[in-house]
């Protein structure tokens, strides 16, 4: 009767485990990347919805007074969080975001901004208003595009 494993059996078992582990690492990386992409989509959507709600409220005259050069858009992202005075109300504010979401690719709350007057592909912000946001990450998507174009 034989006890234990031979060297060949141990090498074969170790090789199988190593092969399975080598296949699992790329799958785990892919899942982490996919999760970050999903979080980026959600964060961008949340901010863009808040920007649109601010613009709608400004167009309806629900908030004010507004600066003329802002064209009805928020001057900063922080204004969406801190709130804007409601028109006709003494101490009431209209808040559009609870907090500025964290960019999952850069792990910061610092987003790239574009104003209404900026070129759509511009990476420098004119500062007049916040018309759109994008990630400041220089990483590329799986299909070769830029996350900053989302």
Where are the language model's segments positioned?
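N-terminal leader/signal peptides at the extreme start of proteins
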Residues: 1-3
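Active-site-proximal cofactor/substrate-binding loop regions of enzyme domains
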Residues: 6
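Ca2+-coordinating acidic residues in Ca2+-binding motifs
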Residues: 9, 27, 79
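Alpha-helical hydrophobic helix detector
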Residues: 11-26
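N-terminal membrane-insertion alpha helix
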Residues: 25-33
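A short glycine-/small-residue-rich loop at the edge of a beta-strand within enzyme catalytic domains
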Residues: 31, 38, 67-71
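Membrane-proximal N-terminal amphipathic helix
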Residues: 32-59
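Low-complexity, acidic interaction segments enriched in glycine
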Residues: 52-150
């Amino acid at each position: 009767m034989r006890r234990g494993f031979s060297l060949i059996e141990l090498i074969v078992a170790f090789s199988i485990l190593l092969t399975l582990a080598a296949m699992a690492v790329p799958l785990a990386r892919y899942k982490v990347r996919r999760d970050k992409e999903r979080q980026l989509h959600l964060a961008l959507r949340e901010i863009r919805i808040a920007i649109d709600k601010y613009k709608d409220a400004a167009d309806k005259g629900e908030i004010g007074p507004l600066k003329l050069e802002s064209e009805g858009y928020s001057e900063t992202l922080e204004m969406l969080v801190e709130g804007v005075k409601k028109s006709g109300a003494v101490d009431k504010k209209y808040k559009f975001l609870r907090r500025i979401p964290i960019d999952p690719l850069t792990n910061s709350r610092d987003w790239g901004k574009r104003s209404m007057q900026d070129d759509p592909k511009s990476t420098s912000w004119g500062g007049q208003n916040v018309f759109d946001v994008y990630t400041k990450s220089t990483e590329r998507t799986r299909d070769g595009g830029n996350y900053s174009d989302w």
